[in-house]
Amino acid sequence: MTGKNLIWSLPIDGTHEVAASAASLSFVGGAGDFDEEGQIRNPDDLKCQLTGAVENIEAAFRQENCGLVDVIRIKAFVTLSEQVCEVSVVEMLLAALPNRPAPVISIVPVVMQPFASQKIQLQAIAKRGWRDEVHCVEECELKIASVDAQGSPVVTTALRAGEVIATANRTAAHCVETYDGGLDGAAQSHVIMGSLNASLRAVGASLQDAVKLEGYYQGTTREQWTPLAKARASYFAEPGPPATVIPCHLGEQDQTMTRVGVLAMRERRNSYDKYIPREDAWPERVWDWPAELPYRQAQKLRNMIWLGGQVPAQPFSNTGKRVHPGQLLPQACFTMSYISDLLRPFGRDPSDLKLLVCYYRSLPECAETEALVQLLTDCCGGVLPPLTLIPVEHMQDTDSTIEIWGVAQG
């Protein structure tokens, strides 16, 4: 067999899936420009790595009987620079993707990547055959206030493929043409949430249909987190969706403090759009937030289980205090126990995960990624599902080192 026919691999020991499916959706976790031995083919070359990562998404999805044409969302964790801005990355992705309308593209600027010489990793969600079925899109020119980019590519800001809906994540600078950095974090959050709701309404849904909220913000303390959290939460009635919000480098280019996107599901019954009821699990042991929020920890619908971001918070409480403060591996093990707790009421366990997303604090003097991956492998029964690893400089506070969420087969 020639090297061209060999499936790529992450540069980790042990067995892992490059793609997997839960009900109607298929997932690729963290595709990079890897060869079959886990080596980066184009070290430190963002453009070539992006092309290679897209090719690897297509190769991975082939085992699930789908391809790039079936992708509904690509999420790019990318190291930006003065030479390469967010608009440039979107343009490169649009050029690498074969069909129109394009899938939703969400960008997350990051300082670090999990593996040496890596500049980008791509997470992808696909729904087989959606282009041949009823679908609906919202498109607009991509303009980011204060970002000096030539041209304005047309992007998909919301895509509804049957019951599944993806929205592009966004900042206040995406939503307000005259944005100049003058809004505080809570005000930026209100602008973003209003824009997301408008995008969802354009395809027949609303924020209440969300199955997953994913957000990022600048901050290192609970005092910085709280006003943004309350602003986002004000757009949901209880029960809200599972949520994950991470302190993350956003890039200085657009002077923003937060970025949010959602995934949603809504059914079409006869001629009406209808909310899809969820099954819910929240065992008493599983922590609650130190602010009163409407989000849930685990919801099942259409044979998929969506998890909220799990953290090593004190069990049986809403204190916000952390177990094993500052210790990555003990906190990772403890956090995975919450994922087990949440899947158990549905008759599932971590081996049923089809996507695993892990944000973790990575310190320069501590090369813990390899040990973390081994721990996650053990917790998932010896075979990792498609995995997105995102190292960050800090988590919610100095005691926190990790947040993990995923999607499981229901």
Please report, for each region that a protein language model flagged, where it lies by residue.
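N-terminal presequence-like segments and the immediate start of the first folded domain
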Residues: 1-72, 78-354, 360-410
